[in-house]
């Protein structure tokens, strides 16, 4: 497993904008990486099986050594428990995709913090301004975005961005007489245009 350095830059900026200390941020990053990677050597601020199977951890378990499939799995990481979770969870997502990119054409006026985190020098005020003046048709690439906001300093990319989506949330509901059933699926389309189900939950029958 190779950590995605661009995603780490974006994560660090979100934490900075949310007034999370550098130490706490480094703990979150290292604990996430240790949970995913296959080795048993903890990083500087990380934790491995010796902690997760030890007496100080209420949930006795081993690190999964795989990527996260749902946001709730992050609750296994000590740095995200308690007040940290309440403070940060709305700004987080989790998909088992190392090259995950955010389609900025889907962002809304309330996503200024996320948008700001994707560029090294983009201020929160400028991010809010851009999203308030974002065309309904979106942009086709970075050059078009930059040309439309030439007075704004973006800096370098500090996250992976896209202008189209390849992850979709499909919700279905069926009813036969008195019986109802529903499902919720996350579907990921790779470059070969084939769809792969990342997760699926059923309710009802």
State where each predicted segment sits.
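Compositionally biased linear targeting/interaction segments
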Residues: 1-205
